[in-house]
Amino acid sequence: MSIKTYDKENSEIHVKTPVESTLWKQSQKKAFNKLKSKINIPGFRKNSSSPQFDKIARAKISKNDIWAKAIDETLNSTFEIARKELDKEDLERILGRANYRVSKITEDEAEIEFFWPVRPEIEDFKYKNLNVKFKEVKVTKKDIDQRIQSLMEMGAPIEESNEPAELENEMVFDFKGFIDGEEFEGGSAEEFKLKLGSKSFIPGFEDQLVGLKAGDEKEIKVTFPADYYVEEYAGKESVFKILVHKVFKPKAKEINDETIKELGFKGVSNLEQLKEYLRPSIEHKLLEDSLTEFKNEAFNKIKELNDIKIPRGLLLEEMTAINEKFNETLKAQGLKRREYLEMTKLSEEKVAEQVKKEAITKINEYLIFEQIKKAENVTISDDIIEDHYNIMAKNYNIEVDKIKEFIPVDKLKEDPNLLNEQVILKLLEVNDKSAFEKANALGKAKNPKSSKGKEKNNG
């Protein structure tokens, strides 16, 4: 008889299930026969069926080895029995695959305990009245000019320039970093090449390089993030001495009717039409940025207001995935893990702490999305899908029907990113109705068929 329990602290459903008695006996016999087939005993042919051979083989093979193989043999059938104990509500709460442990084992009986990570029970989940502001979306002349400039630079040759650097330009420079007046490990480089805006450095670093030109020297101040991977630097203010060697800019095409026509946008043949055409996609990008900013701040508040238990099984899965990705990144950079640890002066224990911290952050976000989705019954409607097709058609300059050929409706209905976007909008709605209505109106305005009249009155 199976026994089901709920581990609230680790947010897991546990089911203890005995292995069927006859199956357990047969599996041990089968396991022994497999193991004895690999043993060579002088005076006997290999895998002999004689009782004397079996007696000697049993003395050589440990019970634990037999039981381990026998458990493997019975695992699937026992799992299916355990799974029948889960009701509809249990199945809806499960967030990942089951793990197991052997809770009882002898020659006569065995019991396997399966445990599934589940969505935690959060009593009185608080996600409303967070007092988080939504940044108003407004397209400026500068936004449009920058987008046009980037279009004119697409595919253009890169050349050295004496002009001040802008975002997306490449820069070659020396830097030397100091914390508390002391130069710190890994904080210096010579003739380092960087694309400004790539976010390769800590926040604020690249922004302060904008406007510098070849030969310029500057001291910039930045603060390491509180969760920075090198604990000794986390949260500390640092000063970097910068010397710029070179700035590279794309040689942009001249903006005229001819180069605008070459972009291939339907119905666009001059500058005013191009500005009109680009405004919705720029607006959409700004809307996405504002929603992301709102989400980050709102989720931080939600974490403070609620006791969210992290499912142990999900945490282990996420930590494994992060570790594997980390190793792949090191391999792509031609580094071994040991070399990385030596360079950064980190121990495996410190890396494990950081991996766990990152995993908890990701799982917290996932659980908050799931909790709001359930509380507000958020789904992807047909209208949302149609709006999304229209946005993609506008952004990629492709007919809606062509987009639908590449991305069928069923795939969009299951798109986790699109669903999460609806969750964020719902969170905005229940916290700031006025801001939601403005954001939702902007989302609808992305439909190319209905946006033109509105765009002329903006920014």
Swiss-Prot record:
Known catalytic reactions: [protein]-peptidylproline (omega=180) = [protein]-peptidylproline (omega=0)
GO molecular function: peptidyl-prolyl cis-trans isomerase activity
Subcellular location: Cytoplasm
Keywords per UniProt: Cell cycle, Cell division, Chaperone, Cytoplasm, Isomerase, Rotamase
Residues covered by the PPIase FKBP-type domain: 168-253
EC number: 5.2.1.8
Domain of life per record: Bacteria
Protein's UniProt keywords contain Mitochondrion: no
Listed InterPro entries: PPIase_dom_sf (IPR046357), PPIase_FKBP_dom (IPR001179), Trig_fac (IPR005215), Trigger_fac_C (IPR008880), Trigger_fac_C_sf (IPR037041), Trigger_fac_ribosome-bd_bac (IPR008881), Trigger_fac_ribosome-bd_sf (IPR036611), Trigger_fact/SurA_dom_sf (IPR027304)
A UniProt-annotated Pfam family: Trigger_N
Sequence segments annotated as region (Disordered): 439-459
GO CC annotations on file: cytoplasm
Location (main, coarse): cytoplasm
A single BP term in Gene Ontology: protein transport
UniProt record similarity statement: Belongs to the FKBP-type PPIase family. Tig subfamily.
Record's comment describing the protein's domains: Consists of 3 domains; the N-terminus binds the ribosome, the middle domain has PPIase activity, while the C-terminus has intrinsic chaperone activity on its own.
Role this protein plays: Involved in protein export. Acts as a chaperone by maintaining the newly synthesized protein in an open conformation. Functions as a peptidyl-prolyl cis-trans isomerase.
Protein name: Trigger factor
Species, as recorded: Mycoplasmopsis pulmonis (strain UAB CTIP) (Mycoplasma pulmonis)
Lineage per the UniProt record: Bacteria, Bacillati, Mycoplasmatota, Mycoplasmoidales, Metamycoplasmataceae
